[in-house]
C-alpha cells in the first residue's frame, strides 16, 4: 500500500481541502474528549466498557448484517481466503469481542500509577506517574475486531481514538462504532472518544498521520505496505507494529515430538496473523532425519513448503498456509539468519540444551523470544494483560504486545514549599 495516490481527478483535488478539514475537525473533537477522559475515575470507565459490551451483544444482528455485506463485496473482489478470515464475524467472534471489553474493564487502570517518587535533599518532593497519551490515531486493515479492541484499550487508558479502518470493513466498522458511541453517550461520557474516519480516500490517512498538534500518536496495524507507508509519511509519532516474519528453529538437541507440535501450532493455528511462523530453520546436524518428518507433518496439514527458498521467500510474510525452509549451521547460524531476515517480532527455538537456549534468547533481536513454545503465544491476552492494540516491533516507545500501560506516557509532579533555584 502507498499513501501517495495515483494521479487524482480534478474533483478529487477539489475535495482535498474538505477531507483535511474533516480529519482535523474530528481530531479537535477527539482532543476535547481526551482531556475529559484523562480525569474520569476508573469505575466510570469500567461501567462504560460493560455498557459497550452489552450494547454489542444487543445489536449482534445489526453488526453481522453489516459484516455480511462487507464479506459479499470482498468475495466479489476475489479477496484471498486469509483476508476473508480476518474480515469475517460470526456470533462466536462477536461474543469474544464483547468478552474482550469486559476483560479490559477488569484490568488495572494505568492512569495515575506512580512509577517512582522521592524527596530531594532540598526538600522537593518528586513523583513520576502515568498519564494518557491523548489522541490515538489507528490505521488498520480489514479486521473489525480491531475497532473494538482499540476502543476498549484507549478508553480504559484515558485516551480518545480516531479510527481509520480498511474500506473492505467499512460497513462492519460503522455498525460497531455507532454502537460504541451510543454506549458512551448512555454513560454520560463523550461519544467523540471514538470516531471513525469513514472516507475511502487514502488521503484521509495522510491527513491523519500529518496532523501535528492534534494527534499524539499514530499506530498502523496491518501488512508491510501499510506500515511502511505510515512510518514513511507520518509527521506525528508512530508506533510500528505487526509485520511478522517469524521463525521456528529446531536445534540439534530438540525433542522432535515437541518440535513437530510447536511447528504445526505456530504455522497452522491461524496462518493469517502476524505471530504465525513463516520460516522453519533446521539444524544441519539433524537435517537428514528431522527434515522428512517435519516437512511431512507440514504437508499433511495442508501447508505448501518452499524447500528451495530464495531471498524473496525468506523475507516473505506469507499470512497463509505456506512456509519457507532453510538449513542452518548450529545455533549461531540460526541467530545470524534470523537477525538478517526477521522483522523483530517473535522467534522460537526448540531444544533441550539450556546453554543453546540462553545463547539464542540473548542474541536474537526480537520483541519476543520463545523457548520450547509456539510463536502463537505473542499476544496481549496470552501474555496475561488483556487485549492488545498491536504488537510493536520497534524499540521506542513500546516493544511487543501493547496493552494499557503502553498507551500512557508519564508526567513529573513536583511539590515544593516556596522553593527557588539558586543562581
UniProtKB/Swiss-Prot annotation:
GO terms of biological process kind: L-proline biosynthetic process
Annotated localization: Cytoplasm
Positions of the UniProt region annotated as Disordered: 1-25
Catalysis performed (reactions): L-glutamate 5-semialdehyde + phosphate + NADP(+) = L-glutamyl 5-phosphate + NADPH + H(+)
One annotated GO molecular function: glutamate-5-semialdehyde dehydrogenase activity
EC supergroup of this enzyme: oxidoreductase
Feature: compositional bias, Low complexity: 1-14
Origin: domain of life: Bacteria
Keywords: Amino-acid biosynthesis, Cytoplasm, NADP, Oxidoreductase, Proline biosynthesis
Main location: cytoplasm
Pathway per the UniProt entry: Amino-acid biosynthesis; L-proline biosynthesis; L-glutamate 5-semialdehyde from L-glutamate: step 2/2
GO cellular component: cytoplasm
EC number: 1.2.1.41
InterPro entries assigned to the protein according to its UniProt record, in alphabetical order: Ald_DH/histidinol_DH, Ald_DH_C, Ald_DH_N, Aldehyde_DH_dom, G-glutamylP_reductase_CS, Glu-5-SA_DH, GPR_dom
Listed Basic and acidic residues bias regions: 15-25
Family label: Belongs to the gamma-glutamyl phosphate reductase family.
Protein purpose: Catalyzes the NADPH-dependent reduction of L-glutamate 5-phosphate into L-glutamate 5-semialdehyde and phosphate. The product spontaneously undergoes cyclization to form 1-pyrroline-5-carboxylate.
Protein's recorded name: Gamma-glutamyl phosphate reductase
Lineage of source species: Bacteria, Bacillati, Actinomycetota, Actinomycetes, Mycobacteriales
Gene this protein is translated from: proA
